[in-house]
Swiss-Prot record:
One of its GO terms (cellular component) is cytoplasm. The keyword NADP applies. The active site is at C53 (thioimide intermediate), D60 (proton donor). This is NADPH-dependent 7-cyano-7-deazaguanine reductase. One of its GO terms (molecular function) is preQ1 synthase activity. One of its GO terms (biological process) is queuosine biosynthetic process. It comes from Exiguobacterium sibiricum (strain DSM 17290 / CCUG 55495 / CIP 109462 / JCM 13490 / 255-15).
Length: 162
């Protein structure tokens, strides 16, 4: 990593970072992709995602899977961690949380392709697993997004009890 790539990163390396308990997309930070000529996936698994049910105010837990093909920018992982943590006291439905996360990451990075899959633990005997994806309009990634959306759960996993 070149020193100038770190100029806009304010959270990485800080020993004392305030944890925000309300949704705050402003905490997300990006840095330059040093390999924009390559197509490659970056994947994050966040097994401790928590938000609140907007009706009951009860906590909802999920593993969030974020995969993307970067273009010019990548998301900085500590800022992503703090961003996901900011949902802790945010009241919203599972489907909206996943769509908001996806749209915030698209706004930040303008990736070639991005998908966000939330696997929420069951409440009332039902688990909800919303899936969001995006492909850069007018590119092969737009068709890729459509194909993956239509086929993303073609062979569903065996649901254990998470």
């Amino acid at each position: 990593m070149r020193p100038e790539d770190l100029n806009d990163l304010s959270l990485l390396g800080q020993k004392s970072v305030p944890y925000i308990f309300e949704y705050q997309p402003e905490v997300l930070e990006a840095f330059p992709n040093r390999h924009p000529e390559n197509d490659y996936f970056v994947k994050f698994n966040a097994p401790e995602f928590t938000s609140l049910c907007p009706i009951t105010n009860q906590p909802d837990f999920a593993t969030i899977y974020i995969s993307y093909i970067p273009d010019e920018k990548l998301v900085e992982s500590k800022s992503l961690k703090l961003y996901l943590f900011s949902f802790r006291n945010h009241g919203d439905f599972h489907e909206n949380c996943i769509n908001v996360i996806g749209k915030d990451l698209v706004k930040l990075m303008e990736p070639r392709y991005l998908e966000v899959w939330g696997k929420f633990t069951p409440r009332g005997g039902i688990s909800i697993d919303p899936y969001y994806n995006y492909g850069k309009p007018g590119t092969k990634y737009e068709q890729m997004a459509e194909h993956r959306l239509f086929n993303h759960d073609l062979y569903p996993e065996t649901i254990d009890n998470r």
